[in-house]
């Protein structure tokens, strides 16, 4: 099995991101699980201020990374459920995985849990003016 490692990056210190990924990857190295790490330090440095990642084009950055989910069996989110709620990029990565039948996991406090249910609620409202 190969998993794509997802973790919040925008607004986070580069060293913290590297440490989270390293900690998780070292645990996975003891298993039969291979990892794809989308974090590129060179790119992070180009998009940081004082060592804090500040994506200038977050959607472009996300798309460049998320395309690699295709090569993986699933996505493993590194962080707490609260971290996930606050990370638009990681939410999108998990939604991509679920939508295409891939497994999703969360690595929190040294434990891995599998996502068993994802509920999306779509609600639309008529637009009063014409779209141009």
PLM ranges: what are they?
Residues 1-132:
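Conserved catalytic or regulatory cores that recognize and/or transform ribose-phosphate-containing ligands
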